[in-house]
Curated annotation (Swiss-Prot):
InterPro entries: 4pyrrol_Mease, 4pyrrol_Methylase_sf, 4pyrrole_Mease_sub1, 4pyrrole_Mease_sub2, CbiE, Cbl_synth_CobL, Cbl_synth_MTase_CbiT, Cobalamin_biosynth_MTase. It is an enzyme of class 2 (transferase). Pathway: Cofactor biosynthesis; adenosylcobalamin biosynthesis; cob(II)yrinate a,c-diamide from precorrin-2 (aerobic route): step 7/10. Its EC number is 2.1.1.132. The keyword Transferase applies. Belongs to the precorrin methyltransferase family. Keywords: Cobalamin biosynthesis, Methyltransferase, S-adenosyl-L-methionine, Transferase. This is Precorrin-6Y C(5,15)-methyltransferase [decarboxylating]. GO terms for biological process: cobalamin biosynthetic process; methylation.
Amino acid sequence: MADVSNSEPAIVSPWLTVIGIGEDGVAGLGDEAKRLIAEAPVVYGGHRHLELAASLITGEAHNWLSPLERSVVEIVARRGSPVVVLASGDPFFFGVGVTLARRIASAEIRTLPAPSSISLAASRLGWALQDATLVSVHGRPLDLVRPHLHPGARVLTLTSDGAGPRDLAELLVSSGFGQSRLTVLEALGGAGERVTTQIAARFMLGLVHPLNVCAIEVAADEGARILPLAAGRDDALFEHDGQITKREVRALTLSALAPRKGELLWDIGGGSGSIGIEWMLADPTMQAITIEVEPERAARIGRNATMFGVPGLTVVEGEAPAALAGLPQPDAIFIGGGGSEDGVMEAAIEALKSGGRLVANAVTTDMEAVLLDHHARLGGSLIRIDIARAGPIGGMTGWKPAMPVTQWSWTKG
């Protein structure tokens, strides 16, 4: 979807009014909202919204088209003429207001929000909203909840439909959080409002209203899969065949990659996908593309991404540099495998954005020679990582060294 266009002449006064409406319908609207709906020649909204406000609508009522972009195009075409859009609760909280604001300047939009379902849920529960974690799985994978499952955490989850609470309970149980308290808050603010609390492992709720929020008070079972917040998570948390950047090296690698909000990483030679996964865990806005030539490993990366709660990780099955063609330009690149192949380093350097970071690791002398050459020509930082782990030697304990890793880090000027 295109962003707000600067080519259109400015319109100072708002012509588009976005009104939040709750389950209490017209009764919950203020006088100004009621007047604007009644006077609007055109009103857009979902079927439920239009039904809730039917007693006020005198103009044309337009149901959202599928895909939504078709309706947005229609609304933009009416620029300068009064249009009202009805939305759930707060239109700028995971709502249609965000979509519209990408195409229409904020000065042209008047917004009259209602309380969001999340705000209503927090008030019903007596939770401090600023201390809770908010996760939307509305039209998105339920696995996005996984990184937030820490004992004692309070998580408010926007679901897609009436099956969401049951599916969430099953995810909690399968991840080792079956003793968590799961509260389902249905049709908040409406006549059919219902609030039910159960233990996830004993979840028995039958028919659930499609408009619901799930509140989780996280409690871990013995052996629960708790994902640490710091980079360099235990290798055992990943499914792998031995091709994995070990946790200590991974922590140093991610430090060198220096993730920043909203950035895109290319992980060339994905192995288990651990670098791309931990990059995405740094912030919900992060993106990563992992390139892996082996089909079995590519499938394994996808499974790891799901289990770590970053199902948005893109896996490209193919061999660099050919597999890099056509990919979106990255802010950072990690080369953990295949860097000594012809053209890989050159293609990565060429693709990287100005100011972007490239980090490459070597465990073979062939790849080390490539890194030494690039360091000599381009500069950057070159370090050697030596890790030794204590282990039994006869009846005593000694140090067992791992293969040394040479790491080259470089920022493109």
